[in-house]
């Protein structure tokens, strides 16, 4: 199965012709769900095998404006609207298209709420980071445990989208206008001028993976502050 985010994968069905690989686009709005499903239907005579709805409480890059993220928008209606869009294509293609809700799923009540809205599954990331089973660096896990609600902020990314991350020493400097010009451009983004960006996102995510948390971009979900110790998935 290919889960595709950071934009709408308009030509994905073309690449998968003749294969049994399943397609699961990530959407954040009724509009984006309508666009990708309509495009696939008309251009490729195909539809999704699963839809993942990533809401405004998710970590990392987000498909919302900064204003939307700061307004605490009520997202339930959007989820139900996307589910209604999916039902049209379930009927047309005579197949089940499970809808999975992601973003802010931090406890059983959030899971139940997602199912009550009509979802068939949930996607959880942040809650599993501070666990023994997670293979993230221990320093990275500790940042989640130390984080308070006010430490979790919306940040500007070189990718051009807002994101949610922990405000550490590095991010405080970025917020205050300091720039970190990369020593070497890796060419990971098509539209990126190393002289203009506040920092190299690849470089800072590598620091996170290596546990250099004072220098890293520490993406997290909105509820990261709710965990105060390393637990186990079991």
Give names to the regions the model predicted.
Residues 58-100, 106-234:
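Conserved active-site-proximal phosphate/metal-binding subdomains
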Residues 5, 103-104:
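Charged, low-complexity surface patches
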Residues 1-93:
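Active-site entrance/lid segments in N-terminal catalytic domains of soluble metabolic enzymes
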């Amino acid at each position: 199965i290919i889960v595709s985010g950071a934009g709408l994968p308009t030509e994905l069905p073309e690449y998968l012709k003749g294969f049994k690989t399943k397609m699961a686009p990530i959407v954040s709005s009724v509009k984006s769900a309508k666009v990708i499903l309509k495009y696939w239907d008309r251009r490729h005579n195909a539809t999704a095998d699963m839809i993942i709805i990533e809401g405004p409480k998710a970590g990392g890059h987000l498909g919302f404006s900064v204003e939307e993220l700061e307004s605490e928008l009520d997202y339930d209606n959007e989820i139900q609207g996307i589910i209604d869009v999916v039902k049209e294509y379930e009927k047309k293609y005579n197949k089940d298209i499970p809808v999975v809700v992601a973003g802010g799923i931090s406890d059983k009540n959030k899971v139940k709420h997602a199912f009550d809205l009509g979802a068939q599954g949930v996607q959880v990331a942040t809650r599993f980071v501070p666990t023994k089973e997670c293979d993230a660096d221990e320093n990275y896990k500790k940042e989640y445990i130390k984080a308070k609600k006010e430490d979790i902020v919306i940040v500007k990314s070189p990718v051009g989208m807002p994101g949610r991350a922990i405000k550490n020493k590095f991010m405080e400097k970025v917020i205050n206008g300091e720039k970190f010009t990369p020593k070497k451009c890796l060419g990971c983004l098509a539209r990126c001028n190393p002289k203009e960006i506040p920092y190299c996102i690849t470089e800072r995510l590598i620091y996170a993976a290596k546990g250099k948390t004072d220098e890293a971009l520490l993406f997290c979900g909105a509820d990261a502050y709710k965990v105060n110790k390393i637990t186990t998935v079991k």
